[in-house]
Amino acid sequence: MTQKPRNADYTKEYNRKAVLSMLRRSSMSRAELARATGLSRAATSLIAEELLKDGIVMELPPQSVGRGRSATPLAVRADSYYALAVDLARKSCSVGLCDMSGHLLQFRAFPDQDGLLDLIIEALRRMAQSVDKSKILGIGISSPGPLDCEGGKILNPPQFDRWHGVEISAILSQALDLPAYLEHDVCALALHQLEMGHSRNFMLVFVDIGIGAAIMSGGELVGNSRYFTGEVGHTTIRFDGRQCACGNRGCLETYASIPALLEGSSFSSWRELADSAEQSPEAQRLVYQEALYLSAGLINLLNLIPVDTIYLAGDVCYRYELLAAHLRQEISAKALFGSTDSIRIYPSSQDPNVGTLSAADVVFDKFFRI
């Protein structure tokens, strides 16, 4: 007797999330929602009325759909809910308040310093006071890994000693009386990239002092993406190669991370290298070398989980086309799944506040996810 109500409640919530997930991407009429979700028009209309009543969606001006007919699109209300966001980076931290449309309403940035956690909490409290707190869904936290995301704990990311062992989710949740969700920065970036709507089957690759990757398949983070994020840099590309800090030899990170690439060269940064690539044979050689090593690690993943797009993030976003041309050539020649034209390579979002927006998307993903 207790099973039926639980199943009915689950089905109702599932259908509601299905409608909301569609509306998050774009405005749609009730008829379009019914076709997109597979729900009946009656069920879709009932859900729409509930969402309108709850103030989560709104009606837009009617639009002509031909033959003298019109339809009234529905859209998510930007001010229906909010998310607080914390983006932890190695040299800085940013805190923000975002609405349901992904607009960054408030923003604070702090350099790495003593007492940083107290500054973060104070900034979050001030932002929370500026809106109806009952509409704040939670706090999204983006951080380099390795992390214990389920436990909300930052483990031991390199060059991140200040945060080692900090149970950040519990601390912020207790301080703000809100749920807090910790996520790998690369996975958070992938969630944000998904919401930009260009692809639902992609790999996002982050290259700086380390290498991380997250994979989206059909709009879902692949189950082991959180594993890939921390470990792709430690896949072996040369069994007798360089010693890695992890204890193994020949890890991708020892060849394709930016510090490894620049070691022994005349360049101090990827930007300097890229700016010299048109005139400097050394720079040209290093760009090709980066593509060669990076592709060796990525092809292993692509052969298991094909995607149509690769997004480059981190330092290599700058003048990305230099690297993309060589990467595409290597992948085309060595991957199992297709030709040069079968995969697109782009830079990830270049919004200067992308880290903060991505942390907010961790919260919104929890709300919208079916």
What positions do the PLM features span?
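Glycine-rich phosphate-binding loop and adjoining helix at the ATP-binding site
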Residues: 104-201, 322-333
